[in-house]
Amino acid sequence: MLLVEPKEVVNIGDAEGELTAENDDRGNYQRSVFRPILQQNTNRGIMLINRLLLSSIIASLMAISAIAQDSKKASKFMVATANPVASKVGYDILKRGGNAIDAMVGVQLMLNLVEPQSSGIGGGAFLLFYDAERNEVSSFDGRETAPLKAKGDLFLKEDGSPMKFFDGVVGGRSVGTPGTLKLLEVTHKNYGSLPWEELIEPTIQLAEKGFRVSKRMASSVEQDAERLKTFPATKSYFFLNDGTPIPEGTLLRNPDFAQTLRLIAAQGSEPFYYGEIARDIVRTVQEAKGNPGKLSLADLRNYWVIERPPVCHDYKQFQVCGMGPPSSGALTIGQMLGMLSHFELDKLSPTGPTFSHLFAEANLLAFKDRGLYMADSDYVDMPTKGLLNPQYLKMRSKLINSSKVSDGMSPGVPPTASNYQLSPDASMELPSTSHFAIVDAQGNAVSMTTTIENGFGSRLMTRGFLLNNELTDFSFRPEQDGQLIANRLEPGKRPRSSMSPTLVFNSSGQLHMAVGSPGGSRIIPYVAKTLLGVLQWNMDIQEAINLPNIAKNFSTMDLEAGTSAEQLKVDMEQLGHKVSVRPLTSGLQGIVITPTGLIGGADPRREGLVLGD
């Protein structure tokens, strides 16, 4: 089976909806579904579409450049991605009658080509999908898995101490079993309307004809040049013949990726998980010079996508739904919003010192619980419902002092967690990844966060795509002070993630918002900030995205350089915060659904673009 039976849904607060377990009519598996209570249902039609006009598509794709924009409005459909070329592919698919899942396939594969440092078929993804006809929210786990031969000491040196982070990243050691392609295939088979091969063809064509290297991609290559030169295949793709990094505007072709996609277009994921692509992936990982890995053909053949129940919680009159474990996103955001709901935020400015202090303290408190409890719940017994228990969050909110930094913040003891004997984990999760949001003409919605973990992943390249370094999202130490760490590496386990694809519903149960971001562990405060901007202060989605970023995942409060947040430094230090002013490059993409149409926003910190009709 491609999908396995999910665990019990997590749904806290006074959320209005129905939870049922039923047999899916498209496959032999059990599924738990969440249905918001709707006053009106939107029917999803199955439409017959003509073949894409590829020549005109490719011409328009090659001409697009990144331009900062205000919020975009549309009445029928909308797509917001991190790259203008990917947005155009999604737009063209929707324009021709394809649905949100069809557009998702086209967008992800194009991102693999034009934003290779952030995501691709060599990595993993989380998808939150709203099926308008069925009035269902589903979440799909395409997260990478640890090789079956990997052990908890994978990132320990001979003396038992953890290796330096990038010593673990670069090479085959860090590569987990990729899940993104399987996720695309499974969801397209269940929900897609256009032919699979038709969705892949635009990326094949552009890979063969060549695309212009964007400013951000060129900058990323330059900044990581030393590591990218480690392996010949990667070096030959990202550098000119004289050894200099590819500059902005270079016409870059990727015939190897085009050939890979032609196989996938014709045969689906079979060659990737069982055939010649699988063999090349394993060979690349196991023969990585200086740092070989454990990934095997058995790992690829045994990979499956898991359809999990979404984690939903209330904020004001809205219901916020996100991805559950192994993602820590929905739980940690839910904790932050739950604690902040006990303060009179309406009386505060979203950019003022008081709110910024409260937000940072809630951020830190939530991360204390995240570090102790959150991991792959198929391997670690988690107090999932207890972490979002309203009374528990009310109690935790009382630890926040509005006039100074609270002393001695530590993990709490949520209901059902009294017998947990674990050690906290403060693993690094560096910024990378990509996010996109799609709403189609039938009202279906996709919120998908996708990654190869660190920028350029393991730096290993095969058949035109990069392989992930997802295993470094596990704790490098399996235990601390004699106690096991929840997010320790175990064979077949999925590493904890901060990816937070989110869907929001209004008090009538109607879809209101799709949002998410890249950014490593700072994804969580980035998305929380944006949700508060829209849901608390009634901001336009673009205004909420544009708000200065603030994060306090650990002991230091980060303020976004080059924004008004810099002016908070003295005030925050007077309250007792240790402050760092630094770039906080989120990549938020969001769509808000209103009675009069769609409003989209893309993060000006990257190259995002919203398109719609």
Description of each model-found segment:
Residues 3-34:
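Double-stranded beta-helix
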Residues 113-117, 124-139, 291-296, 444-507, ...:
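Active-site rim segments in enzyme catalytic domains, especially the processed small/beta chain
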Residues 342-451:
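Internal maturation/activation junctions in enzymes
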